[in-house]
Amino acid sequence: MSRLGFGERVRACVLTGDQISRSLRRISHEILERNASSLEELALVGILTRGVPLAHRIAGNIRRFEGLEVPVGALDITLHRDDLDGEDPEVKGSHIPFEVAGRTVVMVDDVLFTGRTARAAMDALLERGRPAAIQLAVLVDRGHRELPIRADYVGKNIPTSLGESVRVGLVETDGEDGVVVVGS
């Protein structure tokens, strides 16, 4: 996990690749259990960037567990963020190949921190239609919420200080799986 710290001082390795896989299997089972009566209306939407491969991994788990193909989309929240401060943001674009109206949509992200990303994701998703329900799955919840948002599915709760950061690495985006805490 040498690359995950991005040159910063790594304070702790909190999830290995095997632990990430185990957490995602558990989250997948929890999603299936909670939505058992309406699995045909279930969809996953990964929040760019690392939420997308996590959503695909969860969909793969559900396929293996139940033989069910759950549609997966990618959501770019850039234009819905409240912290752009006049910047010229890079918009990568969303790709949601299904109607969200009437579906139970599980938004997937790597880290839940202040709640602002989740709020922006809900705004972006609601522009595409009115889901029956929106749920939130995160690999890591590090606390320090600024908005009244909580995840429905959490891989691991990691208490952190405001001076620390949580870095998630995934094979698909970073070449390796792992979660580290960096900073003071």
From Swiss-Prot:
Alphabetically, the GO molecular function entries are: uracil phosphoribosyltransferase activity
- SUPFAM superfamilies the UniProt entry points to: PRTase-like
Listed A to Z, the keywords are: Glycosyltransferase, Transcription, Transcription regulation, Transferase
Q: Kindly state the positions of the motif PRPP-binding in this protein.
A: 105-117
Which family does the entry's similarity section mention? Answer: Belongs to the purine/pyrimidine phosphoribosyltransferase family. PyrR subfamily.
- Source organism per entry reads Rubrobacter xylanophilus (strain DSM 9941 / JCM 11954 / NBRC 16129 / PRD-1)
Reaction catalysis annotation: UMP + diphosphate = 5-phospho-alpha-D-ribose 1-diphosphate + uracil
In its UniProt entry, what is this protein called? Bifunctional protein PyrR
Source species taxonomy: Bacteria, Bacillati, Actinomycetota, Rubrobacteria, Rubrobacterales
> What are its E.C. numbers?
2.4.2.9
Please name the GO terms of the biological process aspect recorded for this protein, alphabetically: regulation of DNA-templated transcription
The record's annotation in Pfam families points to:
Pribosyltran
Entry function: Regulates the transcription of the pyrimidine nucleotide (pyr) operon in response to exogenous pyrimidines.
Q: Which InterPro entries match?
A: PRibTrfase_dom, PRTase-like, PyrR, PyrR_bifunctional
